[in-house]
Each structure stands twice: as C-alpha cells, then as structure tokens.
Amino acid sequence: MSQPNSILMSYGWDPSIYLEEPKLLEGLKPGRVLAVYGEYSKIIIEQGEKKGIFSGALMASGESIVTGDWVLIREIEGDELCIVEKILPRKTFLRRSNPGKRKGSQAIASNIDLLLVIMGLDNDYSPRRIERYLFLAKVSGAQVTIVLNKKDLCMDPENKFMEIKMIAGETPIEMISALDLKQTRTILQWIDPGKTIAFLGSSGAGKSTIINSLLGGEIQKTNEVKVSDGTGKHTTTRRELFLLPSGGVLMDNPGIREVGLFSEGSEDELEEVFPEIAVAAEECRFNDCSHNEEPNCGVVAAVKDGRISEARYFSYLKLSKELMAYQALNDPEEARKKKQKDKQMSKALQKRLKDKGRK
C-alpha cells in the first residue's frame, strides 16, 4: 500500500480506495495512466513506469482506457509490460460528443480535479465557446477556472474580462499574459499537491506557453510520440500527465476548438451555464416549455424586456437544440419525443401566425 510521500500519492492516489476494492489484495497493484498510445498505455506504479496492455476480459468488456484513469495491474516478472485488469471508478470524466453524426461520446480524460479553460484575448476570443467549455466542465464533475490569456495583445482587456464575467457567474477568472512568468505563476494558487489539472482551449490560445512555464521546460518538443506504439517523434495529439515542481499533476492535452455537446440526462447542466434563463423559466406557463414559440414563455418575456440578452438567449437555444439532437441520435425514445415536440411547436407557431392575421 502507498505510504505518505510515495510516488502514487504525488499523482493523487487515495488510499481509501483500498477499502472499496478488495481485489487489490489479490496480487494486483494500483497505478495511474500517464498516457495512452493506441493499444498501449504508460502507467505509473509505486515501483516506476510500466507499459500496459488490456487483459482479455477487459478488452471483451468494451471499456476504453483514458489518460488519468486509476487502474489495477498485474505485473509480468522480468518484463516492462503489465496487464491492466481493472479500471477503477472515475470521480470525474471529461468527454465531448463524437464529431459529425456518429453516436456516443469521445473520452478526453478522467479524474480531473480542476479544468482551466484557456482563451486568448486576440482572434481566439469567443464568449459563445466559453459557454460550451463551461457546459463540458459541468458535465465532467470537475471544478473550473477561466484563464484569459494574451491581455498584452488586446486593446480593451477589461471590457472583455467583464463580458466573460457576466457569462461565468461565480466561476473564478484570471487574466494574464503567458509571456510574463510572474503572471503565469498566479495559476499555481489553484493547484494543490496531489490534485490534477487539465486545460481546455483551442490551438493558439497559449496553453503550450503556460504549460511549459508551469513545468519549467519545453515539454511539447521533448515528449512528442507516435500514437501507435509510444516511440519516436510523430505527433502531438496525445494527453499526458506530468508532476509539477510545486506539487500537483498537470495534464498536457491537444487544443479543442470544436466542442460537441452531449448529456446523459436532462438540461440541468445547461441551465447551470445559463442561470438567468433558469430563473426566467420559472414564469413559463408550461413545464416542458422549450422557450421558443410557446405562449406565455417567461424566458421570451425576459428577452423582450432586456433581462436576458439576445446573444445569450440565442446561444442557449442553439446549445439546447444540439443537446436534443445528441439525445435523439443515441436514444430512439428521445428521437420520438423530439419529433413529437417539433410537431407541437410547428402547430403552435402556425396558430400564432393565424391569430395574428385575424387582428
């Protein structure tokens, strides 16, 4: 079992998991997935790094392993290879929907304590994308902080800061220039020893500069690997965990500009990103109001009298429609409900137009 100041505890291992996983006493050892290279994974255990491959049973289960996972492995004596026998329960799970019209979601990482949403104040700036990232973070279960980068390249950084603050609500926001080491190091206040942080942001937002600054070196250049087998230089489309000199664990991950939304349940997480719409929705006549064409809609009324901005309203409608499309694609029953609701909305609109023509 890992002791204080052990390698695994520096990567965030919680010894209480032993109480929940009796299989740890059956010749298996805990480890954390540092990176995934196709059918192989780099795993850290108390004795050092191993190259993990799936057991037959785990492969047959259809489960996939992602960077950040805690796993149980069986060592192979005298070999750097180990067998991954079990994936331990994930406390947080970062995903996005598959690109295009493919079903399901795409795993990004697991067991993230804090997501840092990085956005540049240059051409990368997009309040609407911040809303998508916030939704992704809400669904994952991780805490979130927004970092606005490149303030040195922005003519009106304070105005943009206030615009994002209106969107972010109580979510903490930092505004920095990644080229200023002192400013970049302010991020360390959010990182506790043993906690794992990951970055969300598009390519060009300045994540690499921030990561290299926090790690004290250009890890982007020295750790490029082949996705197929983990050797040689080939691509940067990988996610990998690194220990921070100041304590804590950092996940280096590729830029993500296109963030397809998904939800396994209701629109509760979306309403957390749009709290003003959730408040106005309490005044709606119908419990299942879509806040679009239904009569006596509290949200539409709030837009008309200026309590909700049109930009936020139309963004909410777009994301809500995207969620419904995802649910319909992955659930035939949801597809039937969506078709029925679209039909009802169409009839309601026709009636409103007809009534308007009579006046």
From Swiss-Prot:
Domain CP-type G: 101-259
Cellular compartment(s): Cytoplasm
Main localization category: cytoplasm
Cofactor(s) required, per the database record: Zn(2+)
Start-end of Basic residues biased regions: 349-359
Xref: SUPFAM superfamilies: P-loop containing nucleoside triphosphate hydrolases
Gene3D superfamilies reported for this sequence: P-loop containing nucleotide triphosphate hydrolases, Probable gtpase engc, domain 3
Binding residues annotated for GTP, in chain numbering: N149, K150, K151, D152, G201, S202, S203, G204, A205, G206, K207, S208, T209
InterPro entries in the record: G_CP_dom (IPR030378), P-loop_NTPase (IPR027417), Ribosome_biogen_GTPase_RsgA (IPR004881), RsgA_GTPase_dom (IPR010914)
GO MF term list: GTP binding; GTPase activity; metal ion binding; rRNA binding
Annotated GO CC locations: cytoplasm
Top-rank lineage group of the source organism: Bacteria
UniProt remark on cofactor binding: Binds 1 zinc ion per subunit.
Keyword annotations of the record: Cytoplasm, GTP-binding, Hydrolase, Metal-binding, Nucleotide-binding, Ribosome biogenesis, RNA-binding, rRNA-binding, Zinc
PANTHER family: SMALL RIBOSOMAL SUBUNIT BIOGENESIS GTPASE RSGA
Family of this protein: Belongs to the TRAFAC class YlqF/YawG GTPase family. RsgA subfamily.
Its job: One of several proteins that assist in the late maturation steps of the functional core of the 30S ribosomal subunit. Helps release RbfA from mature subunits. May play a role in the assembly of ribosomal proteins into the subunit. Circularly permuted GTPase that catalyzes slow GTP hydrolysis, GTPase activity is stimulated by the 30S ribosomal subunit.
Subunit structure: Monomer. Associates with 30S ribosomal subunit, binds 16S rRNA.
Name of the protein in question: Small ribosomal subunit biogenesis GTPase RsgA
Species lineage: Bacteria, Pseudomonadati, Spirochaetota, Spirochaetia, Leptospirales
